[in-house]
Amino acid sequence: MKAQTIEVTESTGRILCCPIFRSGGKKLLAKGHLMCDEDIRILQSEGMENIWVTELEEGEIGEDDAVRAIASDIICGCFEVKITAGGRANLLATENCCVLVDDDLLKQINCTSSLVIATVLNFSYAQAGQRIATIKSAPFAVAKSDLDGLAALLKQRGPIMQARPLRTPTLGVLYCDPISGERARQMFESIMRQRLERFSIPTPVSLSCVEEEEQVVRSLHSLLRHRPALILVASSTAPAGPEDVVGRALARVGAQLERFLTPVEPGNLMMLAYRDDIPIVSAPGCFRSTKPNVVDLVMPPLLAQYRISTWELACLGHGGLLA
């Protein structure tokens, strides 16, 4: 691709390298515009004689075609692609969803490609219609070899992103307190409602009990029979580890501990376990506050039926200082 200044009369079929404005300041033609005969007549009527343009050479693909070619390959799930002028593709969620991002692959592409990609954070909750990523090409054109290399990398490594829908998931909640389960319910229920409204989650299946091992075990078994997408244990006492009352109860119902302690503040004392494919979160004390905490970070992927690993919890430490 070679930019040059030529006579306006010779510019048909070439790409405008800079915007053109009328004398009064109103934009006449945008950068990247493909010139046609009508444009030439307009510019001549404005008294212009020369124009700065470029044209595609063999082995090059126009900026809009380049982002269009790759947009659907970087993501899977509930999304749509919107192409805008100037070599940009926006990816929008078509349903309420959780966005998962392969950070290593994203960095690799952004270091080596003639296209760059910006996304929302991994594990982000997105509402239908929200922009979750944008792709921008180098100005005017991209080498076909670059595009082919990017396509091959995505075919080998898979998409950079997933938009996993949250389709009215069922949530189970267990309120517990050493003295009275209803005391914990009164302490948490209003806050729980506000938190669930953020994610458009319907009214959960909820139980309350005294924080005593046998009662917690019975309550967990009862909630598990509903097959919820997620069970939250909201206790008036902060988790103390797998040997506390809730931790022992989790083991007795067959749940496997994934991780106790998370590098997120507020929320260091969260405990995550799985009973088969059902995640169970023993919420830390900060859950009593409406302010963002670790539970807000892990709820979207868990509600989208994504199994969070210990490694992924560890990765939350970068940016995990929320307050």
Report each predicted region and the residues it spans:
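Fold-independent oxyanion-binding glycine-rich loops
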Residues: 31, 94-95, 135-138, 174-178, ...
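Phosphate-binding glycine-rich loops and their immediate beta-loop-alpha structural context
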Residues: 139-230
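Short glycine/threonine-rich loop/turn motifs
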Residues: 204-323
